[in-house]
Regions:
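Glycine-centered flexibility motif
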Residues: 35, 146, 179-181, 302, ...
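Residues that act as N-cap/strand-start positions at coil-to-secondary-structure junctions
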Residues: 46-48, 115, 179, 249-251, ...
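Conserved beta-strand position repeated once per blade in WD40 beta-propeller domains
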Residues: 51-53, 118-120, 182-184, 252-255, ...
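Surface-exposed interaction/gating patches
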Residues: 247-266, 367, 372-375, 427-430
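Short, surface-exposed polybasic-aromatic patches that bind anionic ligands, especially phosphate groups
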Residues: 354-474
Length: 474
Protein backbone atom coordinates (compact mmCIF):
# COMPACT_ATOMS: atom_id res chain seq x y z
CA UNK A 1 0.00 0.00 0.00
CA UNK A 2 1.26 3.57 -0.64
CA UNK A 3 3.14 5.52 1.99
CA UNK A 4 1.67 8.68 3.44
CA UNK A 5 4.40 10.92 2.02
CA UNK A 6 4.08 9.36 -1.43
CA UNK A 7 7.82 8.74 -1.65
CA UNK A 8 7.81 4.94 -1.83
CA UNK A 9 5.54 2.32 -3.29
CA UNK A 10 4.89 0.54 0.03
CA UNK A 11 3.37 1.72 3.26
CA UNK A 12 5.67 2.20 5.38
CA UNK A 13 -7.98 15.59 30.05
CA UNK A 14 -4.88 15.50 31.87
CA UNK A 15 -4.16 17.19 35.13
CA UNK A 16 -3.07 20.83 35.01
CA UNK A 17 0.65 21.55 35.12
CA UNK A 18 2.20 23.64 37.87
CA UNK A 19 2.90 27.31 37.13
CA UNK A 20 5.05 28.90 35.93
CA UNK A 21 5.56 26.76 32.85
CA UNK A 22 8.82 26.83 30.87
CA UNK A 23 8.60 28.20 27.34
CA UNK A 24 11.00 27.38 24.51
CA UNK A 25 13.82 26.61 26.94
CA UNK A 26 16.98 25.33 25.20
CA UNK A 27 18.11 21.87 26.26
CA UNK A 28 21.65 20.55 26.62
CA UNK A 29 22.36 17.28 24.80
CA UNK A 30 25.26 14.85 25.08
CA UNK A 31 26.28 11.22 24.53
CA UNK A 32 25.22 10.90 20.89
CA UNK A 33 25.25 7.20 20.07
CA UNK A 34 24.33 4.42 17.67
CA UNK A 35 24.21 3.90 13.94
CA UNK A 36 27.13 1.50 13.64
CA UNK A 37 25.13 -1.55 12.57
CA UNK A 38 21.73 -2.83 11.50
CA UNK A 39 20.00 -4.07 14.66
CA UNK A 40 16.95 -5.81 13.17
CA UNK A 41 15.76 -7.28 9.89
CA UNK A 42 13.12 -9.73 8.84
CA UNK A 43 14.30 -13.18 7.87
CA UNK A 44 13.11 -15.40 5.06
CA UNK A 45 12.16 -13.26 2.04
CA UNK A 46 11.61 -9.95 3.85
CA UNK A 47 12.68 -7.21 1.44
CA UNK A 48 11.94 -4.16 3.59
CA UNK A 49 11.85 -3.22 7.28
CA UNK A 50 10.52 0.07 8.61
CA UNK A 51 8.02 1.82 10.88
CA UNK A 52 9.11 0.28 14.21
CA UNK A 53 7.52 0.63 17.62
CA UNK A 54 10.01 -0.03 20.44
CA UNK A 55 9.18 -1.05 24.02
CA UNK A 56 11.49 -1.36 27.03
CA UNK A 57 9.56 -4.13 28.79
CA UNK A 58 11.15 -5.53 31.95
CA UNK A 59 14.58 -6.94 31.16
CA UNK A 60 14.19 -6.93 27.38
CA UNK A 61 13.72 -4.56 24.48
CA UNK A 62 10.80 -5.52 22.25
CA UNK A 63 10.15 -4.29 18.72
CA UNK A 64 7.37 -4.63 16.16
CA UNK A 65 7.73 -3.26 12.62
CA UNK A 66 6.45 -3.40 9.06
CA UNK A 67 7.79 -5.96 6.59
CA UNK A 68 6.48 -8.75 4.36
CA UNK A 69 6.83 -12.52 4.45
CA UNK A 70 5.67 -14.65 1.55
CA UNK A 71 4.91 -17.36 4.10
CA UNK A 72 2.39 -15.11 5.90
CA UNK A 73 -0.73 -14.89 3.73
CA UNK A 74 -2.32 -12.92 2.23
CA UNK A 75 0.29 -11.14 0.04
CA UNK A 76 0.92 -7.71 1.55
CA UNK A 77 2.46 -5.96 4.52
CA UNK A 78 2.93 -7.91 7.75
CA UNK A 79 3.85 -6.80 11.26
CA UNK A 80 6.94 -8.60 12.54
CA UNK A 81 8.14 -9.05 16.13
CA UNK A 82 11.60 -9.54 17.63
CA UNK A 83 13.39 -8.86 20.92
CA UNK A 84 16.88 -8.17 22.23
CA UNK A 85 18.63 -7.47 25.54
CA UNK A 86 19.33 -3.86 24.48
CA UNK A 87 18.55 -1.40 21.72
CA UNK A 88 21.79 -2.35 19.96
CA UNK A 89 20.41 -5.81 19.22
CA UNK A 90 20.63 -8.09 17.49
CA UNK A 91 16.86 -8.52 17.54
CA UNK A 92 15.65 -12.10 17.06
CA UNK A 93 12.40 -13.97 17.29
CA UNK A 94 11.36 -15.31 20.71
CA UNK A 95 13.90 -17.92 21.73
CA UNK A 96 16.21 -16.93 18.87
CA UNK A 97 15.84 -17.33 15.14
CA UNK A 98 14.15 -15.10 12.62
CA UNK A 99 11.59 -12.46 13.64
CA UNK A 100 8.02 -13.70 13.72
CA UNK A 101 5.07 -12.37 11.68
CA UNK A 102 2.46 -11.65 14.37
CA UNK A 103 -0.23 -9.76 12.44
CA UNK A 104 -1.11 -10.05 8.74
CA UNK A 105 -4.02 -9.10 6.53
CA UNK A 106 -7.37 -10.54 7.60
CA UNK A 107 -8.55 -11.47 4.10
CA UNK A 108 -11.17 -10.37 1.62
CA UNK A 109 -14.04 -8.27 2.87
CA UNK A 110 -12.16 -6.58 5.70
CA UNK A 111 -10.69 -3.08 5.93
CA UNK A 112 -7.26 -4.62 6.63
CA UNK A 113 -7.73 -7.54 4.27
CA UNK A 114 -4.32 -7.28 2.62
CA UNK A 115 -2.03 -4.94 4.55
CA UNK A 116 -1.15 -4.42 8.22
CA UNK A 117 1.65 -1.94 8.89
CA UNK A 118 2.89 1.01 11.03
CA UNK A 119 2.46 -0.64 14.45
CA UNK A 120 2.29 1.26 17.73
CA UNK A 121 2.22 -0.98 20.80
CA UNK A 122 1.48 -0.05 24.41
CA UNK A 123 0.60 -2.11 27.46
CA UNK A 124 -2.04 -1.05 29.99
CA UNK A 125 -2.39 -3.39 32.92
CA UNK A 126 -1.97 -6.92 31.60
CA UNK A 127 -3.19 -6.10 28.08
CA UNK A 128 -1.09 -5.13 25.09
CA UNK A 129 -2.71 -2.88 22.48
CA UNK A 130 -1.45 -2.82 18.89
CA UNK A 131 -2.64 0.16 16.84
CA UNK A 132 -1.88 -0.26 13.16
CA UNK A 133 -2.59 0.89 9.60
CA UNK A 134 -4.79 -1.49 7.63
CA UNK A 135 -5.78 -1.58 3.97
CA UNK A 136 -7.76 -3.97 1.80
CA UNK A 137 -6.07 -3.06 -1.49
CA UNK A 138 -3.82 -0.40 -2.98
CA UNK A 139 -6.51 2.15 -3.79
CA UNK A 140 -7.21 5.81 -3.07
CA UNK A 141 -7.98 6.75 0.55
CA UNK A 142 -7.97 3.05 1.41
CA UNK A 143 -6.00 3.25 4.66
CA UNK A 144 -7.66 3.22 8.09
CA UNK A 145 -6.52 2.48 11.65
CA UNK A 146 -7.33 -0.68 13.58
CA UNK A 147 -6.41 -2.10 16.98
CA UNK A 148 -5.69 -5.60 18.27
CA UNK A 149 -5.17 -6.87 21.82
CA UNK A 150 -2.87 -9.49 23.31
CA UNK A 151 -1.87 -10.96 26.68
CA UNK A 152 1.78 -11.27 25.64
CA UNK A 153 2.49 -9.07 22.61
CA UNK A 154 2.75 -12.12 20.36
CA UNK A 155 -0.73 -13.55 19.86
CA UNK A 156 -3.15 -10.85 18.72
CA UNK A 157 -6.94 -10.64 18.52
CA UNK A 158 -8.53 -7.87 16.50
CA UNK A 159 -10.68 -5.60 18.65
CA UNK A 160 -13.76 -3.55 17.74
CA UNK A 161 -15.16 -6.52 15.85
CA UNK A 162 -12.35 -6.28 13.33
CA UNK A 163 -13.59 -2.87 12.18
CA UNK A 164 -11.40 0.24 11.94
CA UNK A 165 -11.39 2.64 14.86
CA UNK A 166 -10.26 5.65 12.80
CA UNK A 167 -11.14 6.25 9.15
CA UNK A 168 -10.28 9.17 6.85
CA UNK A 169 -12.25 12.32 7.64
CA UNK A 170 -12.68 13.20 3.94
CA UNK A 171 -12.66 16.90 4.79
CA UNK A 172 -10.76 17.55 1.57
CA UNK A 173 -9.26 15.42 -1.19
CA UNK A 174 -5.78 16.29 -2.39
CA UNK A 175 -3.27 14.64 -4.70
CA UNK A 176 -2.02 12.56 -1.76
CA UNK A 177 -4.59 9.75 -1.56
CA UNK A 178 -3.11 7.88 1.42
CA UNK A 179 -6.01 8.27 3.87
CA UNK A 180 -5.65 7.68 7.64
CA UNK A 181 -2.84 5.69 9.26
CA UNK A 182 0.61 5.73 10.87
CA UNK A 183 -0.81 5.71 14.44
CA UNK A 184 1.13 6.33 17.64
CA UNK A 185 -0.45 5.60 21.03
CA UNK A 186 0.30 6.71 24.61
CA UNK A 187 -1.55 5.96 27.86
CA UNK A 188 -1.55 8.82 30.39
CA UNK A 189 -3.76 9.56 33.40
CA UNK A 190 -6.45 7.13 32.27
CA UNK A 191 -6.54 8.45 28.70
CA UNK A 192 -5.55 6.65 25.52
CA UNK A 193 -3.91 9.22 23.22
CA UNK A 194 -3.74 8.43 19.51
CA UNK A 195 -1.73 10.54 17.06
CA UNK A 196 -1.98 9.75 13.34
CA UNK A 197 -1.77 10.90 9.74
CA UNK A 198 -4.89 11.76 7.73
CA UNK A 199 -4.17 13.20 4.30
CA UNK A 200 -7.88 14.08 3.96
CA UNK A 201 -7.87 16.27 7.08
CA UNK A 202 -8.83 19.91 6.71
CA UNK A 203 -5.73 21.11 8.57
CA UNK A 204 -3.14 19.20 6.53
CA UNK A 205 -0.69 20.96 4.24
CA UNK A 206 -1.14 20.79 0.45
CA UNK A 207 0.97 17.61 0.29
CA UNK A 208 -1.14 15.93 2.99
CA UNK A 209 1.34 16.31 5.86
CA UNK A 210 -0.02 16.74 9.36
CA UNK A 211 -0.55 14.93 12.64
CA UNK A 212 -3.87 14.77 14.45
CA UNK A 213 -4.53 13.71 18.05
CA UNK A 214 -7.56 12.00 19.56
CA UNK A 215 -7.99 10.77 23.10
CA UNK A 216 -10.51 8.56 24.90
CA UNK A 217 -10.70 6.47 28.04
CA UNK A 218 -11.81 3.63 25.76
CA UNK A 219 -8.89 1.86 24.01
CA UNK A 220 -11.01 1.30 20.87
CA UNK A 221 -12.25 4.92 20.87
CA UNK A 222 -15.86 3.77 20.82
CA UNK A 223 -17.09 6.67 22.95
CA UNK A 224 -16.05 9.70 24.97
CA UNK A 225 -13.72 10.78 22.18
CA UNK A 226 -11.98 14.15 22.31
CA UNK A 227 -10.10 15.74 19.42
CA UNK A 228 -7.21 18.17 19.68
CA UNK A 229 -8.34 21.53 18.35
CA UNK A 230 -6.83 24.98 18.30
CA UNK A 231 -7.75 25.58 21.95
CA UNK A 232 -7.10 22.14 23.38
CA UNK A 233 -9.13 18.95 23.53
CA UNK A 234 -12.83 19.12 22.68
CA UNK A 235 -15.51 16.42 22.61
CA UNK A 236 -16.39 15.12 19.13
CA UNK A 237 -19.14 12.71 18.06
CA UNK A 238 -16.88 10.38 16.07
CA UNK A 239 -13.25 9.62 15.30
CA UNK A 240 -13.67 10.87 11.72
CA UNK A 241 -15.02 14.27 12.74
CA UNK A 242 -13.42 17.20 10.86
CA UNK A 243 -9.68 17.50 11.47
CA UNK A 244 -9.41 21.19 12.33
CA UNK A 245 -5.97 21.33 13.93
CA UNK A 246 -2.70 19.59 13.09
CA UNK A 247 -0.15 19.46 15.87
CA UNK A 248 2.89 19.24 13.58
CA UNK A 249 3.61 19.15 9.84
CA UNK A 250 4.90 15.61 9.44
CA UNK A 251 4.31 12.08 8.22
CA UNK A 252 5.10 8.87 10.12
CA UNK A 253 5.73 10.47 13.53
CA UNK A 254 5.93 8.94 17.01
CA UNK A 255 4.50 10.20 20.30
CA UNK A 256 5.85 9.82 23.86
CA UNK A 257 5.16 11.28 27.31
CA UNK A 258 8.24 12.43 29.28
CA UNK A 259 7.40 12.74 32.98
CA UNK A 260 10.83 14.15 33.82
CA UNK A 261 10.10 17.14 31.56
CA UNK A 262 6.33 17.16 32.13
CA UNK A 263 5.88 17.20 28.37
CA UNK A 264 4.78 15.24 25.34
CA UNK A 265 7.34 14.78 22.59
CA UNK A 266 6.76 14.11 18.90
CA UNK A 267 9.54 12.53 16.85
CA UNK A 268 9.57 13.07 13.10
CA UNK A 269 12.20 13.10 10.39
CA UNK A 270 13.84 16.26 9.07
CA UNK A 271 16.81 16.90 6.81
CA UNK A 272 19.46 16.27 9.49
CA UNK A 273 17.83 13.44 11.45
CA UNK A 274 15.01 12.79 13.90
CA UNK A 275 13.55 16.00 15.29
CA UNK A 276 12.19 15.79 18.86
CA UNK A 277 9.57 18.52 19.47
CA UNK A 278 8.15 19.26 22.92
CA UNK A 279 4.54 20.08 23.84
CA UNK A 280 2.70 20.73 27.08
CA UNK A 281 -0.15 18.46 28.20
CA UNK A 282 -2.70 20.31 26.06
CA UNK A 283 -0.39 20.50 23.00
CA UNK A 284 -0.83 24.30 22.98
CA UNK A 285 2.67 25.50 23.94
CA UNK A 286 6.29 24.42 23.47
CA UNK A 287 8.06 24.23 26.86
CA UNK A 288 11.42 23.37 25.26
CA UNK A 289 13.17 23.98 21.98
CA UNK A 290 13.43 21.00 19.61
CA UNK A 291 16.48 18.73 19.59
CA UNK A 292 17.73 16.49 16.77
CA UNK A 293 18.99 12.91 16.89
CA UNK A 294 21.27 13.09 13.88
CA UNK A 295 22.04 10.56 11.19
CA UNK A 296 20.56 9.02 8.04
CA UNK A 297 16.94 7.96 7.72
CA UNK A 298 14.44 6.79 5.12
CA UNK A 299 11.21 6.44 7.10
CA UNK A 300 9.67 7.50 10.40
CA UNK A 301 11.32 6.76 13.77
CA UNK A 302 10.26 4.50 16.62
CA UNK A 303 11.02 6.03 20.02
CA UNK A 304 12.24 3.66 22.73
CA UNK A 305 9.43 3.85 25.29
CA UNK A 306 8.18 2.16 28.42
CA UNK A 307 5.10 -0.08 28.05
CA UNK A 308 2.66 2.81 28.57
CA UNK A 309 4.35 4.96 25.94
CA UNK A 310 6.31 7.01 28.48
CA UNK A 311 10.00 7.83 28.29
CA UNK A 312 12.41 5.44 30.02
CA UNK A 313 14.36 6.79 32.96
CA UNK A 314 18.09 7.34 32.84
CA UNK A 315 19.99 4.46 34.41
CA UNK A 316 22.66 6.93 35.55
CA UNK A 317 20.70 9.95 36.79
CA UNK A 318 16.91 9.52 36.56
CA UNK A 319 16.19 12.97 37.97
CA UNK A 320 18.94 14.79 36.08
CA UNK A 321 18.93 13.47 32.52
CA UNK A 322 16.59 11.90 29.98
CA UNK A 323 17.59 9.39 27.27
CA UNK A 324 16.07 9.76 23.81
CA UNK A 325 16.64 6.72 21.60
CA UNK A 326 15.09 5.87 18.25
CA UNK A 327 15.20 3.01 15.78
CA UNK A 328 14.65 3.93 12.13
CA UNK A 329 15.14 2.62 8.61
CA UNK A 330 18.26 4.12 7.06
CA UNK A 331 18.47 3.04 3.40
CA UNK A 332 16.27 2.25 0.43
CA UNK A 333 16.75 -1.43 -0.30
CA UNK A 334 16.42 -3.65 -3.33
CA UNK A 335 12.62 -3.52 -3.12
CA UNK A 336 12.78 0.30 -3.41
CA UNK A 337 11.41 0.51 0.13
CA UNK A 338 13.02 1.49 3.46
CA UNK A 339 15.13 -1.06 5.36
CA UNK A 340 18.24 -1.44 7.56
CA UNK A 341 16.82 -0.60 11.00
CA UNK A 342 19.46 1.11 13.13
CA UNK A 343 19.54 2.60 16.61
CA UNK A 344 20.47 6.24 17.30
CA UNK A 345 20.20 8.24 20.49
CA UNK A 346 21.37 10.99 22.82
CA UNK A 347 20.78 12.27 26.35
CA UNK A 348 19.27 15.54 27.54
CA UNK A 349 21.29 16.66 30.56
CA UNK A 350 20.90 19.23 33.32
CA UNK A 351 17.25 18.39 33.96
CA UNK A 352 15.81 19.33 37.37
CA UNK A 353 13.08 16.69 37.31
CA UNK A 354 12.75 16.10 41.06
CA UNK A 355 12.69 19.53 42.73
CA UNK A 356 10.22 18.48 45.45
CA UNK A 357 8.77 15.28 46.94
CA UNK A 358 5.63 15.34 44.78
CA UNK A 359 7.58 15.59 41.53
CA UNK A 360 10.04 12.94 42.73
CA UNK A 361 7.20 10.48 43.29
CA UNK A 362 5.71 11.27 39.87
CA UNK A 363 8.97 11.00 37.93
CA UNK A 364 10.19 7.79 39.59
CA UNK A 365 6.79 6.05 39.70
CA UNK A 366 7.01 2.47 38.48
CA UNK A 367 10.76 2.26 39.05
CA UNK A 368 12.44 -0.69 40.79
CA UNK A 369 16.02 -0.68 42.07
CA UNK A 370 18.20 -2.56 44.58
CA UNK A 371 17.43 -2.01 48.25
CA UNK A 372 20.04 -1.63 51.02
CA UNK A 373 19.16 -5.16 52.22
CA UNK A 374 20.00 -7.08 49.01
CA UNK A 375 16.36 -7.16 47.97
CA UNK A 376 14.52 -4.78 45.63
CA UNK A 377 12.55 -1.60 46.21
CA UNK A 378 9.59 -0.68 43.99
CA UNK A 379 8.07 2.80 43.90
CA UNK A 380 4.43 2.70 42.84
CA UNK A 381 1.45 4.89 43.60
CA UNK A 382 3.58 7.07 45.85
CA UNK A 383 4.61 4.14 48.07
CA UNK A 384 7.96 2.37 48.35
CA UNK A 385 7.47 -1.41 48.47
CA UNK A 386 10.28 -3.78 49.45
CA UNK A 387 10.31 -6.92 47.30
CA UNK A 388 12.33 -9.99 48.27
CA UNK A 389 12.64 -11.42 44.75
CA UNK A 390 14.05 -9.47 41.81
CA UNK A 391 11.88 -11.38 39.33
CA UNK A 392 8.76 -10.14 41.13
CA UNK A 393 10.01 -6.55 41.07
CA UNK A 394 10.63 -6.87 37.33
CA UNK A 395 7.10 -8.19 36.78
CA UNK A 396 5.53 -5.34 38.75
CA UNK A 397 7.67 -2.43 37.59
CA UNK A 398 7.85 -0.26 34.51
CA UNK A 399 11.64 -0.18 34.59
CA UNK A 400 14.43 -1.73 36.66
CA UNK A 401 17.70 0.05 37.45
CA UNK A 402 20.86 -1.68 38.64
CA UNK A 403 21.91 1.42 40.59
CA UNK A 404 19.72 2.70 43.43
CA UNK A 405 18.66 6.36 42.98
CA UNK A 406 19.46 8.43 46.09
CA UNK A 407 15.89 9.74 46.17
CA UNK A 408 14.74 6.28 47.32
CA UNK A 409 16.69 6.72 50.55
CA UNK A 410 14.34 9.52 51.60
CA UNK A 411 11.21 7.36 51.33
CA UNK A 412 9.87 5.06 54.07
CA UNK A 413 9.13 1.43 53.22
CA UNK A 414 5.34 1.11 53.19
CA UNK A 415 5.11 -2.69 52.90
CA UNK A 416 7.13 -5.78 52.04
CA UNK A 417 6.39 -8.54 49.53
CA UNK A 418 8.09 -11.45 51.25
CA UNK A 419 8.98 -14.61 49.35
CA UNK A 420 6.05 -17.06 49.29
CA UNK A 421 3.92 -14.50 51.13
CA UNK A 422 0.12 -14.70 51.10
CA UNK A 423 -1.95 -13.86 48.03
CA UNK A 424 -5.65 -14.14 47.21
CA UNK A 425 -7.83 -14.25 44.12
CA UNK A 426 -11.55 -13.74 43.58
CA UNK A 427 -13.94 -13.93 40.65
CA UNK A 428 -14.30 -10.58 38.85
CA UNK A 429 -11.78 -9.04 41.23
CA UNK A 430 -8.40 -10.36 40.17
CA UNK A 431 -5.32 -11.24 42.18
CA UNK A 432 -3.70 -9.43 45.10
CA UNK A 433 -0.86 -9.79 47.56
CA UNK A 434 -1.89 -9.59 51.21
CA UNK A 435 0.56 -7.24 52.92
CA UNK A 436 0.05 -6.38 56.59
CA UNK A 437 -3.57 -7.49 56.34
CA UNK A 438 -4.35 -5.28 53.33
CA UNK A 439 -4.98 -6.17 49.69
CA UNK A 440 -2.48 -4.89 47.14
CA UNK A 441 -3.96 -5.79 43.72
CA UNK A 442 -1.64 -6.79 40.88
CA UNK A 443 -2.28 -7.07 37.15
CA UNK A 444 0.58 -9.45 36.46
CA UNK A 445 -0.65 -13.04 36.97
CA UNK A 446 2.99 -14.10 36.88
CA UNK A 447 3.94 -12.04 39.94
CA UNK A 448 2.49 -14.35 42.64
CA UNK A 449 3.88 -17.40 40.82
CA UNK A 450 7.32 -15.83 40.59
CA UNK A 451 7.07 -15.02 44.29
CA UNK A 452 6.30 -18.62 45.21
CA UNK A 453 2.89 -17.53 46.49
CA UNK A 454 -0.16 -19.76 46.10
CA UNK A 455 -3.18 -17.49 45.66
CA UNK A 456 -6.03 -18.57 47.93
CA UNK A 457 -9.45 -18.36 46.27
CA UNK A 458 -11.90 -16.22 48.23
CA UNK A 459 -15.38 -14.91 47.47
CA UNK A 460 -15.95 -11.44 46.03
CA UNK A 461 -17.59 -10.48 49.33
CA UNK A 462 -14.50 -11.55 51.26
CA UNK A 463 -12.32 -9.60 48.83
CA UNK A 464 -14.44 -6.48 49.26
CA UNK A 465 -14.25 -6.78 53.05
CA UNK A 466 -10.46 -6.48 53.06
CA UNK A 467 -8.89 -3.10 53.75
CA UNK A 468 -6.98 -1.97 50.69
CA UNK A 469 -3.42 -0.87 50.27
CA UNK A 470 -2.16 0.75 47.08
CA UNK A 471 -2.60 -0.86 43.70
CA UNK A 472 0.42 -2.61 42.22
CA UNK A 473 -1.15 -2.39 38.76
CA UNK A 474 1.37 -1.14 36.20
Amino acid sequence: MPQADGQHSEIGGGKPAAAPRPSNVPLTTAAARGGSATVAAGGLDAAYNYGPTVMIDGGRTRMWWCSQYGSAPPPGDDILYAEAPTLDGPFTGPGGGVPRAVLSGSGDGHFDGRHTCDPSVIRVGATYYLYYTGAAEDHAFGNSIGVATSPDGLTWTRANGGRPIVEPAHDVHRDNVYGAGQPSAVYLDGWFYLMFTDTTGRATTPNGAGQFVLRSRDPVFGGGVESLGKHGFEAVPATNSPRTSSVIEAFSADLMWVEALDAFVIADETKTGTRISFFDRSFTTHPYQPIVVGGPWQEGPGLARRPDGHAPLSAVDPCGQVPFDVVRATVIGAATAPTDLRHYGLDVKGVNACPDPARTLAVLDGLAAPSPTRTMDLLTGGKLIRVDRRSVAVALSGQVLDQRPPQFDKLPVAATIASAGPAVQAKDRGVAFVLDGKLWPVDSPAAPVLNGSVAQTISPAQWDAYPTGSSLVR
